[in-house]
């Protein structure tokens, strides 16, 4: 029995609320159970210096956690004067994931910056950030098109992410903190809406796990991503 009472192949209660911020070109509050991440997309009509003149755009991301998003307060990284390795890893992952489904030539020389702020953390913050950021990115690009500054569809597919793990030897979908902190193995899967693999991050926490167990995790992830993509579509439909 999972701590939450969920079936092994069940996601947490997922809510993707688009248009959450009135200022950003695109935004989405992604709620994966008790994990809440605000994702905003901002359009900058310039690209990094190393890309100028190349005729291509760029999509990048920043990630951060509010001091009391966790059980005990954590100092802001700005107060420490540097980002942690974990923060840098996660924001690079978010950027890579979104670029994998964006036709950078079609958007022209603009940069879209995704800001992912964890309001409350209960496991799976990076997966919530990726899933919500895609919704925010889509919104921003749609608004860009309406202004006559670009042409859709620069997004080639959906992208979403979910975690899976082995808890007491059983493969389970979408780990919360209680499961993630005790899992024998866990993995984050970033997949496209058509089933393409963008990135898989997997770790054995106690002892190696078998290939057959990994395939169980992958099958769960594929099921979860299918459901998340359906929620992304529903979120965008609610804006029309």
Swiss-Prot record:
PROSITE patterns: RIBONUCLEASE_PH (PS01277). GO terms for biological process: rRNA catabolic process; rRNA processing; tRNA processing. Phosphate binds at residues 86, 124-126. Its EC number is 2.7.7.56. It comes from the Bacteria. Keywords: Nucleotidyltransferase, RNA-binding, rRNA processing, Transferase, tRNA processing, tRNA-binding. SUPFAM superfamilies: Ribonuclease PH domain 2-like (SSF55666), Ribosomal protein S5 domain 2-like (SSF54211). Disulfide bonds: none annotated. Pfam families: RNase_PH, RNase_PH_C. GO terms for molecular function: 3'-5'-RNA exonuclease activity; tRNA binding; tRNA nucleotidyltransferase activity. It catalyses: tRNA(n+1) + phosphate = tRNA(n) + a ribonucleoside 5'-diphosphate. Phosphorolytic 3'-5' exoribonuclease that plays an important role in tRNA 3'-end maturation. Removes nucleotide residues following the 3'-CCA terminus of tRNAs; can also add nucleotides to the ends of RNA molecules by using nucleoside diphosphates as substrates, but this may not be physiologically important. Probably plays a role in initiation of 16S rRNA degradation (leading to ribosome degradation) during starvation. Belongs to the RNase PH family. PANTHER family: EXOSOME COMPLEX COMPONENT, EXOSOME COMPLEX COMPONENT RRP41. Homohexameric ring arranged as a trimer of dimers. This is Ribonuclease PH. It comes from Rhodospirillum rubrum (strain ATCC 11170 / ATH 1.1.1 / DSM 467 / LMG 4362 / NCIMB 8255 / S1). The gene is rph.
